[in-house]
Amino acid sequence: MDAQPEFEALRHESSSWWHTARRKLLREAVAQAVHGKRDARVMDLGCAAQLDCPQADSVRVLNAHSSLPALAFRQIEGSQNLICTSSEDLGFVSNSFDAIVAGDILQLVPDDRLALRELRRVLKDGGLLCLTVPAYPFLWGEEDEARGHQRRYTATELRRKLNNCGFEISRVSYLVATGFLPSIVARTFKDLFRKSVAPRRISEGGSRLANAAMVSLLDCERHLIRYINLPFGTRVVCWARKPALVAERVTVPAWDRQWSRPPLPQGMTMSQPDLH
């Protein structure tokens, strides 16, 4: 099977306005999370941030995705440390990562609470989770079906789920406010003049001029949300942390269990040390 058409679609999608803006947003979150740290470990879940950065000597990046074609594309584009894994069962030891970024991943997972608990488990104490998800269930459309989405979120719902899964919320904001009203108009128009057609994948690209204009507008929004939370938009972005000093059950190989106390001789207690 020729994978070239699929790779071309992924390459075109990677240069679209939303993917470009999301990439900048997630990279900023990682830069903030690892600032001043040595040998920091970061997971790019969904490979949305493309974090193969110059400071690779101080930041170790793991690119994770559940799709083999997507990982193959990232390998062609030069990404390293690629792994195919599920958001609901990452397969890493607890407390492994200083930061995790997940660009538009949570809405694809059948059990998003299970995925959030798994992300929390592999984060180090105080570690940062930055994620983006599509906003508002009433904006659900053919594109969501074509992309395999399970749901859309409100900021309140996302905040509640993160809190219930043990995260401390730093900030939650809407994003792509400039595209919110056009999305409502388009959604209403499609509802009024719906046709019986199969769902199709809709590109977030468009003309180069429109793409560049949207990138510039979202650059402005990205700088704006440093100071205020936007009240509406077509995406939700959240910064959350795993609370510090939270004990986690860690599975350690038997040969590494140097902390294990050998069993006491029969009849001896902690108050009766062996003096011989």
Q: Where in the sequence are the language-model features?
A:
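Conserved N-terminal segment of class I S-adenosyl-L-methionine
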Residues: M1-N95, A99-G103, L116, P231-V236, ...
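Conserved S-adenosyl-L-methionine
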Residues: F167-A177
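A short His-aromatic
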Residues: Q107-L108
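Short, glycine-/aromatic-enriched active-site segment of Class I SAM-dependent methyltransferases
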Residues: F7-R11, L129-R151, A155-N163
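A short glycine-rich, Lys/Arg-flanked "PGG" loop and its adjoining helix->strand segment in the class I
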Residues: R113-L128
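A C-terminal cap/extension of S-adenosyl-L-methionine-dependent methyltransferases
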Residues: G179-D256, S260
